């Protein structure tokens, strides 16, 4: 009984250290700055890797003032008139 308890405790310690090496801060992620001795965090900022997403792509593709508006007059509300001779939003 005591042998199995000791064996279980040893296995738990082994697993704890093995998992500890893979989870959390990896070596080299947090280093000491040479100039001032402060700790520096070298981990990648995952927030900066995200790309902004839009649900309404058609809103980004609208024509702005002074650009070609086509035959249908698809101008934004800031300059709603499509000139017939130039086909530009004014």
Swiss-Prot record:
4-carboxyglutamate sites (modified residues): 67
Propeptide residue interval(s): 28-62
A GO molecular-function descriptor: toxin activity
Signal sequence coordinates: 1-27
Record has Signal as a keyword: yes
Tissue-specificity statement: Expressed by the venom duct.
Record protein name field: Conotoxin ba9a
């Amino acid at each position: 009984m005591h042998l199995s308890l000791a064996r279980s405790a040893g296995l738990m310690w082994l697993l704890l250290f093995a998992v500890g090496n893979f989870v959390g801060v990896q070596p080299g992620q947090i280093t000491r700055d040479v100039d001032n001795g402060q700790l520096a965090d070298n981990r990648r900022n995952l927030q900066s890797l995200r790309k902004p997403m839009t649900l309404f792509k058609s809103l980004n593709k609208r024509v702005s003032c002074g650009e070609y508006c086509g035959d249908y007059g698809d101008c934004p509300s800031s300059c709603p008139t499509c000139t017939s001779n130039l086909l530009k939003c004014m």
